[in-house]
């Protein structure tokens, strides 16, 4: 009986505890920041995928933004294949900016502008 109780505890309670560090408190989730630029790096890794986007600032200087996303499995569940975005692709994003005003965002939505309809050109997909 004790083993059964521990098994139930492990299956029900522990997965909820392990998800606790996935908070979005460091982002301004009540508003979106819109960016357009060129993908410089793509890292589809656990526990968070990352895209590094080169964007032109107000003085026409290139600035790199770090865009945090969900896991590779989470992206697949959202219909995003690994080749949806590649290095060198032009994209538009809507993201939640980091509260400390660094060039970092929680990536909400991404629209590829690479011209390849096979890879979803012009189709906005959710990344979180």
Question: PLM features: residue spans?
Answer:
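Short boundary/loop segments of OB/S1/cold-shock single-stranded nucleic-acid-binding domains
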Residues: 18-33
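Conserved hydrophobic positions within beta-strands
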Residues: 37-39
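Short aromatic-glycine-enriched beta-strand elements
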Residues: 45-56
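Short, structured beta-strand/loop micro-motifs enriched in basic residues and often containing a Trp
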Residues: 68-77
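OB-fold/S1-family single-stranded nucleic acid-binding modules
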Residues: 98-127
């Amino acid at each position: 009986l004790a083993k059964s109780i521990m098994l139930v505890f492990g299956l029900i309670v522990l997965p909820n505890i392990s998800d606790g560090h996935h908070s979005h408190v460091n982002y301004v989730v009540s508003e979106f920041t819109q960016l357009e630029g060129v993908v410089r790096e793509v890292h589809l890794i656990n526990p968070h995928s990352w895209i590094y986007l080169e964007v032109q600032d107000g003085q026409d200087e290139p600035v790199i933004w770090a865009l945090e996303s969900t896991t590779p499995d989470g992206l697949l569940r959202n219909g995003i294949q690994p080749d949806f975005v590649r290095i060198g692709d032009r994209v538009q994003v809507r993201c939640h900016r980091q509260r400390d005003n660094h060039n970092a965002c929680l990536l909400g939505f991404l629209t590829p502008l690479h011209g390849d309809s096979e890879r979803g050109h012009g189709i906005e997909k959710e990344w979180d």
